[in-house]
């Protein structure tokens, strides 16, 4: 009869079976094909939805603007961004024919004048929601006033410019503004003359005569009246010789209560 394996032999075969089984399992794991994914079908993380686009830095303020900030004057664009700004003395196409603001690119006012200007803008928009005030000049350093005076002294235009040696004008206190109105398309309302026109046609005291003479249309006169209405109601006073110029206080009051900008 066949010989039955002894106890030791059975134990040996049992260990051999275990070793072979473990070896086969290990090989199976090592040789298992690696799962790969076609790069064309890989899912990508939508970075654009999770990472905000970088915000461009705000333009650096000019040296003069920082100085006006330190004196407590108010940047018009920061106080009311709905008011348009186009400083005419940052270009040479003004009555002097020269660039007067080499550094200043921002429009500033004294806080008292800024408060009234914001009210004027609000009054205008209550009547014409699509309209806006546009500022052509505001606070003006006395050093710039001197440049302007040097251009006109000895000419017939000197009567339109305040002499800096006598304290300058209300612009030099941040208490005057040169201003007009934009329509709902962003275009300036016709006023009969450009801003900064030094001549009789810009005088507000002769508008009826100018209309009668055909030098000013009735619509242009009405546009001027609208500008004066909102500015006066807000606390400004018009300058008789310039339809665009408005003062917040008198020159005497400015000298007594306010500080001139050097």
Map each language-model feature to its residues.
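Positively charged n-region of N-terminal signal peptides that target proteins for export
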Residues: 5-13
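Conserved metal-phosphate-binding beta-hairpin within the catalytic cores
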Residues: 246
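Segments that shape or occlude catalytic/ligand-binding pockets
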Residues: 141
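Extracytoplasmic cell-surface/polysaccharide-interacting catalytic and binding patches
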Residues: 28-138, 148-151, 155-241, 250-262
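C-terminal motif of bacterial Sec signal peptides marking the signal peptidase cleavage site
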Residues: 23-26
């Amino acid at each position: 009869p066949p010989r039955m394996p002894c106890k030791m032999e059975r134990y040996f075969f049992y260990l051999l079976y275990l070793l072979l089984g473990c070896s086969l399992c290990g090989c199976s794991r090592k040789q298992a094909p690696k799962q790969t994914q076609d790069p064309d079908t890989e899912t990508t993380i939508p970075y654009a939805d999770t990472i905000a686009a970088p915000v461009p830095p705000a333009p650096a303020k000019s040296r003069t603007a920082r100085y006006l900030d330190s004196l407590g004057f108010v940047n018009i664009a920061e106080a009311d961004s709905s008011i348009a700004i186009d400083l005419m003395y940052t270009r040479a196409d003004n009555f002097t024919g020269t660039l007067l603001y080499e550094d200043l690119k921002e429009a500033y006012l004294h806080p008292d004048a800024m408060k009234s200007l914001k009210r004027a803008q609000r009054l205008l928009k209550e009547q014409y929601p699509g309209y806006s005030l546009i500022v052509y000049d505001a606070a003006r350093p006395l050093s710039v006033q001197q440049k302007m005076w040097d251009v006109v002294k000895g000419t017939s235009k000197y009567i339109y410019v305040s002499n800096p040696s006598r304290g300058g004008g209300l612009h030099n206190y941040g208490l005057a503004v040169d201003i007009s109105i934009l329509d709902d398309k962003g275009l300036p309302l016709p006023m009969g003359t450009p801003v900064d026109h030094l001549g009789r046609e810009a005088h507000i005291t002769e508008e009826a005569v100018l209309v009668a003479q055909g030098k000013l249309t009735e619509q242009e006169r009405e546009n001027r009246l609208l500008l004066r209405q909102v500015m006066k109601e807000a606390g400004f006073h018009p300058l008789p010789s310039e339809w665009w110029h408005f003062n917040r206080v008198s020159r005497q009051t400015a000298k007594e209560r306010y500080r001139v900008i050097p």
